[in-house]
UniProtKB/Swiss-Prot annotation:
One of its GO terms (biological process) is glyoxylate metabolic process. Residues 28-535 are lumenal. Disulfide bonds: none annotated. This is Alpha-1,3-mannosyl-glycoprotein 4-beta-N-acetylglucosaminyltransferase A. Residues 1-4 are cytoplasmic. Glycans are attached at residues 77, 458. Pfam families: MGAT4_cons, MGAT4A_C. GO terms for molecular function: acetylglucosaminyltransferase activity; alanine-glyoxylate transaminase activity; alpha-1,3-mannosylglycoprotein 4-beta-N-acetylglucosaminyltransferase activity; metal ion binding; protein homodimerization activity. The keyword Repeat does not apply. It comes from Homo sapiens. Belongs to the glycosyltransferase 54 family.
Amino acid sequence: MRLRNGTVATALAFITSFLTLSWYTTWQNGKEKLIAYQREFLALKERLRIAEHRISQRSSELNTIVQQFKRVGAETNGSKDALNKFSDNTLKLLKELTSKKSLQVPSIYYHLPHLLKNEGSLQPAVQIGNGRTGVSIVMGIPTVKREVKSYLIETLHSLIDNLYPEEKLDCVIVVFIGETDIDYVHGVVANLEKEFSKEISSGLVEVISPPESYYPDLTNLKETFGDSKERVRWRTKQNLDYCFLMMYAQEKGIYYIQLEDDIIVKQNYFNTIKNFALQLSSEEWMILEFSQLGFIGKMFQAPDLTLIVEFIFMFYKEKPIDWLLDHILWVKVCNPEKDAKHCDRQKANLRIRFRPSLFQHVGLHSSLSGKIQKLTDKDYMKPLLLKIHVNPPAEVSTSLKVYQGHTLEKTYMGEDFFWAITPIAGDYILFKFDKPVNVESYLFHSGNQEHPGDILLNTTVEVLPFKSEGLEISKETKDKRLEDGYFRIGKFENGVAEGMVDPSLNPISAFRLSVIQNSAVWAILNEIHIKKATN
């Protein structure tokens, strides 16, 4: 009997291992195919860009010829003697060109016409590395000459030393030297090759710099928002630097994260970032934030970089990069007829913050000449007191008295935990969706590691179906209906409420947590997850 049981157990273990291996192989092959398709698409896109450049050049030359022909025609007043030198076909073609106004689609060259002067304007002047592609995460680090101190070497050591061996094979760090002084660039490259020769030869680190022809004339920029001429020039060039770096990095991986050259990182940062992105793979996010400071730790999906770069090119002289990013989100999801709170809720679904921060700013001397910046991320050392999920856009409200600014809105958007003074019978927490949602499951977790006793007790979970009549529900579900149309579907036990939503109740208009009895303790809500049903 023991032998038989052992044989069965061995067989089950073998089958389980085989199925697991088969699933992993299938998943890995699917991922590799996706990356291969992305590379082919981006290679085609680059060929189209080069073709567009040449077409724009020829179009510009042709327009010049047409204008000259018009001028000659006007000066000679259509004299036949002046036109006898042209063949009939040439005269016909020129007549068509001068009589029609062709429509042209605006392109990058409309906003940066100086790029047409040199075909190599969008090709790195210096490029060091073996051109690794097909990774999960590309890290972009722009660096420029600093008058006092460079933090680049320390930043790279922090990033590299906190990577496990297998993680070093799944990412690439691109250092962008935003200078056109070729001697200075070669000096930086020499230092990096000396310090990180192994990482460069392995493909983990790459170094690039733009050609001088990439930059337009930055001497006559309009001063805006009270910034000095020097600061306007600095932020304008910075926008262009970001764009060049993003264009270079786009074809290399699935995600691109923007870093700076004066930061340090937390241990296990790479795995944390990758897992957080995978957790949100079914959501339509645009920016994942792993730091609250400026442009540090902002991660994008590689295909989205096209839209971001195009938008920045349109307004690179107008505003700083972080403002432009917020404008992109506003354009995508905000309704001008709705209020600011509604807009913030919509943007929060595209711009998702991870806490605590994984990157800390350490540079004291800015790349802007003479500027001292004592910027630190206050969330860097904080323990994680809430768990973040992407929830359906909703208007939230509560009858509970909020303690010290720990509001329900911040909790729902993943910014903070909710903390309220002693609940009493009749109190509620309400999540009213902007539009009805098909919900699969729910999870509400109260208390946290600093205040484990501040939990919700004697509290029920209720939902309001969008359809008040005609619901095809079981008698058991029907018995849970309340007078105001809500259905009681669960309750808190040991500070946690979780469960599935009966599909017959979908779509749902609102979730409500109702306090049934007076509580003797305060209440913290540190996790809210209303999971949408997958179609």
